[in-house]
Amino acid sequence: MELNQVLEKKEQILQYLGTLVGLHEKALSDVNSASQVTSIRKDITICLNDLCRINDLLVSHDGLLKREIGSLLRDKQELLELNEREQLLWKERKSWHIEQETDAAPADYVIDKDAIITISSHHRTSLNKYIESVGAENTILSNTDDSDAMIEEVQNAESSADQMIRNYKLLQLSHKQAKSEIIRLETLLRDFKKDNKFIEEELKRQSGRIRSEMGNIDFHLSKIEESKHQLMKRIGFESPLTQEKSLSEKIFNLRLSSADEDYNERQTINMKNFVHMKDLIELKIEDLQEQLTRNKNESSTVLTQRELWLDCQKKVGDLESKLITKLRSSSNSKIPPNEMSEMINSTIQYLNNLLDSSDEKLTTTLISNERDVLSKACEELHSESTTPQDGSSALPSKPIDIHKSHKGSNASSNLKQPSTPSFLVASKSPPKIGISESVVNANKNDAISKKVE
């Protein structure tokens, strides 16, 4: 049975016991209800036995309170371990976080001299000499509107054959050099493009590996979150920091370039939840430890109450048995008032001694009820013994009514100490035990009142 159920049963028994105390007083003072006294006494005894069993169940070596405290201590240790693992994972995840692209090279980055490529433009030397030889205005660079035929006619008139051949050779050399340099640049460009393609493929591959590592970390974070949710349910904790999405949903939606504020917000929420959960567990442990101490003290008190009540019952039962025996052995079924008063006074004195040793309201009330009815009987006996009547002296009405309700062996069996049924086994009633819901429900007082009346 769970701790809360046991505590609930204990409260029900206490409520029912309080009702029985009132019924006990009423039954003792009402002649018409005298037949119910034995049943009510048994119910009170059963309730006290049940309270003793419940307290034993709570405070024993492996009692419910100690088990609950042990469970909470394990929950606290689990929470601390989960938080430690979670913080390590968040720290590791941060180390895998890719910052936004930057143009700045690392501080330890050194350029390899062999990687420096010099681009030449030798064709420009030949080309410049050609332009100087013929003149820029006599080339297609000129903005003149003259036709090519007119330019060619002027050049032919001003240049000799050797000059023209030399200019032609300069153009050939420049052309050859330009083609050679273009080929070199195109080759270099192809190499650059090939390198760039390789870089892009490697970026994808490395990005995938980084995502895989982060995904693995996120997976473990989600598992920790599931464990923390289960722990929250066990300790009855509801986070005041509600989120639109669960941590798992948010965590798997993170990108490599996720905003730092999401990361920081998640860490803040986790840390606050951890602090709240830890505080709640510690408060529960403290409360249960106080309960344990309180119940240990109550166990001693309830045991004392039960023993006093059993002593009271035994003494009253012995008195009733003696009176019944004397009534049977008497020739006219009568007992002299003085003799009866002595027997009752002896019991009253014993009950007074019990009251002196008790400072608990429950047993004080119950024993006082039993003593008071005996005192009243003594007063009636004393009154009758001092007032002569015709014929034989009449016995007091109340004691006679109580005792005559027990006949033969039934009277003796009713005065025996009732055996206590198994704990929480309501089906073994009558009498009903203190934890029966049918007895301690909202209508229990009416039902029991009808029983007495």
UniProtKB/Swiss-Prot annotation:
Compositionally biased residues, Polar residues: 384-395, 408-422
Domain of life of the organism encoding this protein: Eukaryota
Coiled coil ranges: 144-213
Membrane-topology annotation of the record: Peripheral membrane protein
GO cellular component terms, semicolon-separated: phagophore assembly site membrane
Signal peptide feature range: none
Gene Ontology terms describing biological process: autophagy; protein transport
Annotated protein name in UniProt: Autophagy-related protein 23
Source species: Saccharomyces cerevisiae (strain YJM789)
Gene name linked to the record: ATG23
